[in-house]
Amino acid sequence: MIWYLCLSNCQFSLQCFSCYFLEGFIMISSTNFIYLALLPPLLAPIFIFIFKNNQNLRDSVGLIGSLISFYATINITNDLMNGGSPNLYLFNIFSDLSLSFKVTPLGAVFGLLCSGLWILAAIYSIGYMRGNNEKNQTRFYIFYSLSIFGALCVAWSSNLLVLFIFYEFLTFATYPLVVHKETDESIKASRL
């Protein structure tokens, strides 16, 4: 019966199995994919802090978040390439100025780079941080995740005010990464 319903609705498309189960649910739009791309790096620090005493869980939060964010960014880029205009409106600041995000072709490329490299860097940083017995690994992962959030927001900012806000956010989020080792050299480098 499931296949009969699907065959009549989809005519043998790859969505046959999912159309039966997803019927009546909200389909994921490009706006929801922007949420899906931005929420993992924003929420991951909370879970990283919660799991700070369990290295495996703490480190897997960053990796899972990077995979979700990359998946959403691929779908956003796909929507843009198919003629869509992915955007996310949050609220008005002034009458003509809003806190919103709009994905442009260059922003989509930058978003793919950020979220794609986040996966590789997350895998590498787990081995590097554990192999060198680095201190404050939880702090590193929290601010690394927030930096990815800031970079995606900069890439998809819809106006100069949003760009400025999240560029400054990115500046403050990367500062603890620069001074992570807390040596005189790293503190001196952070002052530049």
Predicted regions and their residues:
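Juxtamembrane transmembrane-helix termini
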Residues: 44-47, 120-123, 172-182
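Cysteine-centered motifs
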Residues: 6, 10, 16-19
